[in-house]
Every structure is written in structure tokens, then in C-alpha cells.
Amino acid sequence: MAKRIVCFGDSWTYGSDLVDPALVPVLEKEGYSVQDAEYKYFHKNLPYREEHRYSNILEKELGIPVDNLSEQGDSLIGMRVKFIEWMHQQPKDCPSTLVIFATTAHERYSFYSAKDKQWLHSGYLQYGGMHHPLVEHWKRHLVHSSSPELHDYTLLDFVMTTRALCKEHNMSWIYAPVFPMNSHGRIEDESVTEWSMSDICRQREMEGHKVWAWGEHPNELGHKFIAKHLISFMKERKLIQ
């Protein structure tokens, strides 16, 4: 049974667009959009974002520690490296640890900047949210290297690596795709959820619930629904009591 959970993922796991309502009028008065809270008031909004994302809801509901090691815009490439680095710091035998991989679109790409000591993700390259001397070079690389075969390999490499390391360290794991599986590759594993996080939110939206935040991310209620589905899945697999 899990006594600790660790989450890896992209902006959905990070809690993007979860903004403290008290900051909304401040941002509007200063001429910023609500989505600018992450950059203009990072430290002020941090407690609110962390409290309302699904990982913290899991921690409260299950009464066990949950570490969130996600990053906005992350790719399977970036998540894979972060997981390996984290794994090197763990004991050889971790039977009470459960890892949740909130897998993202397999066509995403990440470059590591040794100078900046951070990952630079293709989403920011494509939408102009990154300023770096090598941006034009990376854009050219993405155009000439993108292919269905490469994307499928990226997903396969991620799944095989993470699964093998979890088995080696006697950890449990879950693959919980953010997007519908058939749209971004399919994971063949007994520990993958039959639903995606976006499926959950769209279904609840059809039922009349307001589940979306300011951008294309779940709001506080959306994160509650995601946590509820994860808990049900964990109980079905007897990963938690």
C-alpha cells in the first residue's frame, strides 16, 4: 500500500491558471490578464495554486504525503530525465511509494540549457513565450525532426524507462494521460487509466459543471474531479486502502 505519492507532469499537474481570486482585481487594475498571475505575482499566488491542484487534494483525502515535481510546458523528454534524476536519490527498495505520471502530448520536445540550468520546452518556442539566442535554431530543429515515428518512439521510450525503473525499485506506478490517448499515442500498460484528465473535465462540463480556469486548464472543481477519479483508480488496483 502506498504511503507516499510522487507526481510528474506538465501544466495540468503544476496547477496552471489556478489564480487566487484576491489577485484578479489587482491584475486587472494594472492592465494584466488573469493568466499573468504566474509571472507577475508568482510568490503571492503560489500558496493558492499549490493548495487547489489535484496533488494536494490527494494528500488531504488520503492523509499521506504527495510530492509534486511537475513543470509548466513539460514534455515526456523532460519528465523522463527529471524522473531518472529523482530516482537516483531514492533507496533501492521503495515498496510504499506510488508514482503518478500525468503523461502529456508525445510530440512535445524539450531542450536543456546548460547556461540557464533549466529545460526549455517546445510549447514556448511555438507560441513565442521564450527569448533565447538559440530559439531560431531549435525551431528549425523541430520542423525538420518532427515525425509520427519519432513521437511514438518518445512515448515508448518514456513508458519503458519509467516502468523498468519503478519495477527495479519495487515502486507502484500509474499512467494518467492528460489528453485523450488516441490523439497523442497509446500507452500499453496495465497501470494506465482508461480515461484522460481532459476527458474527465469535458464530461463534467457536459453535465453542467464549470470545470475550466482562465485558460485551457482545469479550475479548482476540475482538479477535484481529477483527484476523485485517481483515488477510485488507486482503490480498484488496491494501491491504497
Where are the predicted features?
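Serine-esterase "nucleophile elbow" of acetyl-processing enzymes
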Residues: 1-78, 225
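Short, glycine/acidic-rich beta->alpha junctions
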Residues: 50, 79, 154, 158
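Outer-membrane beta-barrel proteins
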Residues: 76-86
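Alpha-helical cap/lid subdomain in secreted, periplasmic
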Residues: 84-241
